[in-house]
Amino acid sequence: MAFLVALLVVLGLQLVQSNALTCHVCEAQNSYACSNPSQCPGEKKFCLLAVTRIFERFFYVSKQCTRRCPTPVVSPPSTNPPSEPKEFLIEKPMPFLFYKCCQWDSCNGEGPPTDQLLKEQPGKASGRRHRYIELLLTGFMVLTANGLSALCLL
C-alpha cells in the first residue's frame, strides 16, 4: 500500500506545473544573438535585457533573470491591439543603450525593434581626430618605466 501511495505521489509531481519563468541567460558582444534558455529561481520574476555601450562602436549585451525591474514592464503579446512597448532607447551621455524588462517565457531573446543602436557615425573612422601623441607618450612611459625606476630617475 505504501509503495502504491509513493508511486502516485511521484507520478503526480510530474503533472504539477512549474511557475518558474524561463529567460535567456547569456552575454555577448556586438550581437543580440546569444540564447541560453534557463529556468529562473523562484524569487526572480523578471527577464532582463540590457545593452551597454563600451566604446563608440562596441556594445555589450546581457540577458538575465532578475528580482526587480527598475523600468515599466513590457506586456506579453496578445490578440488585443498591442500596447505601446515600454522599452528604453537611451542617448548620450548614459552608457545604457537599451533596457527591457518583461515577465513571460523567453521574452528577453530579441533586441530593440530597430537598429537605432547601430547608427553609423558620419565620416570615415580614419578621418576622425586622434591623439597619437598622447598614445605615443603613454606607450613610451609604460615601456621605459622599469628602466627609469632602476636608475632612480622616476
Curated annotation (Swiss-Prot):
Residues annotated as domain UPAR/Ly6: 21-117
InterPro entries, alphabetized: LY6_UPA_recep-like (IPR016054), Snake_toxin-like_sf (IPR045860), Sperm-ZP_regulatory (IPR052874)
Covalent lipid sites (GPI-anchor amidated glycine): G123
Any one Gene Ontology cellular component term annotated for this protein: cell surface
Tissues expressed in: Strongly expressed in testes and weakly expressed in the epididymis, ovary, and uterus. Expressed in testicular germ cells (TGCs). Expressed in the testicular seminiferous tubules, in spermatocytes, spermatids, and testicular spermatozoa.
Subcellular location: Secreted; Cytoplasm; Cell membrane; Cytoplasmic vesicle, Secretory vesicle, Acrosome
A GO BP annotation: binding of sperm to zona pellucida
Disulfide bond entries: none
Classification via Pfam families: UPAR_LY6 (PF00021)
Observed phenotype of the null mutant: Knockout Ly6k mice are viable and show no overt developmental abnormalities. Males are infertile.
Signal sequence, renumbered to the chain: 1-20
Proregion residues excised on maturation: 124-154
Membrane topology: Lipid-anchor; GPI-anchor
Keywords: Cell membrane, Cytoplasm, Cytoplasmic vesicle, Glycoprotein, GPI-anchor, Lipoprotein, Membrane, Secreted, Signal
Summary of the function given for this chain in its UniProt record: Required for sperm migration into the oviduct and male fertility by controlling binding of sperm to zona pellucida. May play a role in cell growth.
Assembly mode: Interacts with ADAM3 and TEX101.
The protein, known as: Lymphocyte antigen 6K
Organism of derivation: Mus musculus (Mouse)
